[in-house]
């Protein structure tokens, strides 16, 4: 068993409160105000953010009503609290219609889901707030991209979507949007998917992500490059952005809140990373939850997908232990 597999095994069996503790730096809190405050702190440092309400899969109509209210409340808060450089908001289609995942695919009222998504996009557009359709597991990929295509054809420009490099289908999905101009986040993806539809090894996923970023840029889309991998970023910056003279207005780099990449982020932001000498927008993912259950589910998936975060969490724990428990003893040496 490799070290990363061992960490995934540990993550799969430890209780929820420990999961939340290890992943504490990666969740803004348990109310909207916590996320807004975190986004404001990033804004003061020149860092953009995207806010996400954790939780998915509406089980009944009241869940949908609540999700609509919460998304509208978040849109209102972003519009009122930020004059410039407003955070974007990530939204999940599974919160906006009751769906059931079956062997034959997703059973859902697609028209109702579309109506609810469009209502939020229209509401956000009036408030000048940008939205993103978050990507969930493979059951939701078709519906999410169908909705995004309809929104683009209707002329909405305040919406983006996500493409995952682990899925075999992604190159075909990119070709689908060749005659439209959209905003796409290119990432590996957090959901472990079956081997008949997805790559299983991270190095191959990173190779595919490089290709997908290239294809998206070539097609004229705005690309959100979502990775912490310094080597992958170096390849993208050297062989794509610099070599093809891509202006910084065509892309941005996205990372998770809490992952220790401050030096790398700083170099990218001031135009000192590799041979690309222009300042680049940096956006951090700011998730928050209204319940510990939703936070635990996200944190466990995140730790499983990125085992290195377990190491970061352990270091954070030891740092806190050193600065809270050991500090009184140092004073009396």
Q: Which stretches of residues belong to each language-model region?
A:
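Positively charged, amphipathic and often flexible ligand-engagement surfaces
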Residues: 1-333
